[in-house]
A protein has these predicted regions:
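Bacterial N-terminal signal peptides
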Residues: 9-21
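Boundary at the C-terminal end of the N-terminal hydrophobic targeting segment
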Residues: 24-26
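A short beta-strand-turn-helix
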Residues: 32-55
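Short active-site neighborhood of thiol/selenol oxidoreductases, capturing the structured segment around
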Residues: 48-68, 171
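Short, thiol/selenol-centered motifs that function as redox-active sites or metal-ligating centers
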Residues: 61-71, 93-94, 133, 190-193, ...
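Short, internal strand/loop/helix patches
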Residues: 103-145
């Protein structure tokens, strides 16, 4: 009897172990729908079976000077990876489309902008500051999150040239089917405001 109970327990544990990754896979592959600056819906991570295409989200705030200073570098990186999709995500949930479009006119990033009023992409990536990058596979796996480079040492203090180009190196590694190295330090930048509850 005891041996039978042990066997049943082992079988159940094996079943849980097999089921676990399936549940995790489903959780990480949930589709995300946001809108671009023209009000058009954009769907991400719809294909759970495709791992070929990379999607890079750069989280920005219009009034963050560090974000705006990275425009030339981000345009350079974008041109270096023409097969990769780049988007800037306006992370402030209260930002209007008109405000985002105005910022887009003043700072030409060279790739599309997205509104994230419900902070779906913020939560999915775990981004906390701007500018911060998140790299996903097209099936919704987070492959990298962190700074663009280490140009900024602190607020108001930066190097002429970065010592580590973290985002660029991460993309190169991923495209070679290698794991990307995540920075030990969070990006220097502006904190992403959290969405307020409607009842507060």
């Amino acid at each position: 009897m005891i041996r039978s109970k042990i066997s049943t327990a082992l079988l159940f544990a094996a079943f849980v172990l097999l089921l676990g990754p399936v549940q995790l896979w489903a959780a990480t592959s949930n589709p995300v729908t946001v809108t671009d600056l023209n009000g058009q819906a954009r769907n991400f991570f719809p294909d759970k079976n495709s791992r070929e295409k990379l999607v890079v989200f750069i989280f920005v705030l219009p009034d963050c000077p560090i974000c705006n200073s990275y425009v030339p570098e981000l345009k350079r990186i974008r041109k270096s990876f023409p097969q990769t999709e780049f988007y800037r995500v306006y992370a402030d949930p209260d930002l209007t489309a008109a405000e985002a479009r105005q910022h887009s006119k003043e700072y030409d990033f060279g790739f599309p902008g997205l509104l994230d009023p419900d902070q779906q992409l913020v939560r999915k990536s775990g981004a906390t500051r701007t500018p911060e990058a998140a790299v996903f596979s097209s099936d919704g796996r987070l492959l990298y999150r962190g700074r663009i480079d280490d140009r900024y040492v602190d607020f108001g203090k930066k190097r002429d040239q970065p010592q580590h180009r973290d985002l660029e190196k991460a993309l190169m590694s991923i495209l070679k089917n290698k794991a990307a190295r995540w920075p030990d330090q969070p990006p220097i930048g502006c904190f992403i405001p959290t969405k307020k509850n409607s009842g507060s």
